[in-house]
């Protein structure tokens, strides 16, 4: 998803 909030997704 989002790079900052969900760096793995």
Curated annotation (Swiss-Prot):
Domain of life from the UniProt record: Eukaryota
What additional remark is attached to this entry?
A: On the 2D-gel the determined pI of this protein is: 6.1, its MW is: 81.5 kDa.
Q: What is this protein called?
A: Putative acid phosphatase PS18
State the species of origin: Pinus strobus (Eastern white pine)
């Amino acid at each position: 998803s989002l790079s900052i909030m969900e760096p793995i997704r």
